[in-house]
Amino acid sequence: MSPIIDALVPMVVEQTSRGERSYDIYSRLLKERVIFLTGQVEDHMANLVVAQLLFLESENPDKDIFLYINSPGGSVTAGMSIYDTMQFIKPNVSTVCMGQACSMGAFLLAGGAPGKRYVLPNSRVMIHQPLGGFQGQASDIQIHAQEILTIKTKLNKLLAEHTGQPLEVIERDTDRDNFMSADQAVEYGLVDAVLTHRSA
């Protein structure tokens, strides 16, 4: 992080028997098993999220992890590293959309533990087909085009599994940018409920 960004991250000071201990707010929330996935999904961010998931599993493999998502999407391979880790680890990963979960963000939102995927009421969710661009020789472009189609098929099959929608519906609905409100995301099966208040 840049020094300017570091200065904007709040610090939390706790009193312990051994004196004061200060944490940045994200580290303090990590103690409560809360992980933030915000901004563009890319390799560096994915590595941090994966490391936090693995750390929390080692701390307690039987306690839920909460993944808060506010993302416009990003790299498919970076997103799949997070997704595969979510499925691999023992704790349930509860996903919560705040703001937006678009593209790979929506895919990760849907990949949370069944019954534990949530969206806040004024958030938006967007699904679409993977994007790609490549330059080079015609044969290389053809190889990359085929790879994008393979990835598209894989993502559609996984979305069908997580939403309960037929594959042909997913294929149709991801053909172009498809925005949904919180209630529409629940109806579609991307999430299980809209959260308006914390339960008592």
From Swiss-Prot:
Molecular functions (GO terms): ATP-dependent peptidase activity; ATPase binding; serine-type endopeptidase activity
Please give the catalytic activity noted in the UniProt record: Hydrolysis of proteins to small peptides in the presence of ATP and magnesium. alpha-casein is the usual test substrate. In the absence of ATP, only oligopeptides shorter than five residues are hydrolyzed (such as succinyl-Leu-Tyr-|-NHMec, and Leu-Tyr-Leu-|-Tyr-Trp, in which cleavage of the -Tyr-|-Leu- and -Tyr-|-Trp bonds also occurs)
Provide the protein's localization.
Cytoplasm
List the disulfide bonds in this chain: none
The Gene Ontology biological process annotation of the record reads: protein quality control for misfolded or incompletely synthesized proteins
Q: Which UniProt keywords apply?
A: Cytoplasm, Hydrolase, Protease, Serine protease
InterPro entries linked: ClpP, ClpP/crotonase-like_dom_sf, ClpP/TepA, ClpP_His_AS, ClpP_Ser_AS
Q: Which domain of life is it from?
A: Bacteria
Keyword Hydrolase appears in the UniProt entry:
yes
Keyword Cytoplasm listed? The answer is yes
Q: Which GO terms describe its cellular component?
A: cytoplasm; endopeptidase Clp complex
The UniProt record lists the EC number as 3.4.21.92
Q: What does this protein do?
A: Cleaves peptides in various proteins in a process that requires ATP hydrolysis. Has a chymotrypsin-like activity. Plays a major role in the degradation of misfolded proteins.
Q: Quaternary structure?
A: Fourteen ClpP subunits assemble into 2 heptameric rings which stack back to back to give a disk-like structure with a central cavity, resembling the structure of eukaryotic proteasomes.
Per the record, the similarity remark reads: Belongs to the peptidase S14 family.
In Swiss-Prot or TrEMBL terms, this protein is called ATP-dependent Clp protease proteolytic subunit
Q: Which organism is it from?
A: Vibrio vulnificus (strain YJ016)
